[in-house]
Amino acid sequence: MKKKTAIVSGYFDPLHVGHLEYFQLSKDLADELIVIVNNREQCLLKKGDEFMIEKDRLKIVYHLDMVDEAILSCDKDKSVCETIRMIKRMKPMDELIFCNGGDRQIDQNNIFEFKVCQELEIPMVDGLGDKIRSSSEFSGLIEYDEPNAFNRE
């Protein structure tokens, strides 16, 4: 039997209630939910640092009830294109869908994964959940006298 698998991605740095809504709405569309967690290198590209180390973010996401698999992104840029390709190879018989949160609209100019999803015939769903919070809202509240404890430089 062909399984429908929803794929979501993000930094989840830190995870907040908006992410939980995004995960649940995505899971409601499928039999299985795979969450791609952006890696440390991607955090550095996006915001210069990470609030939580990647392994902690991955473990927290994996232990959520609605999440079936959590995968650390293998990409070296801000996209998760190569990780989506890897999932497609791992699950060739599954019907995959790529879901975006409420703050992202499907547009080839603002979603890095647009072209790879077209190429692999993976439908995209957008607007899942309201923009309740921004992770940067939380991480910006903490000031350090010392360098960030999670900085591995």
Feature locations, PLM:
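Nucleotidyltransferase catalytic core that binds NTPs
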Residues: 1-153
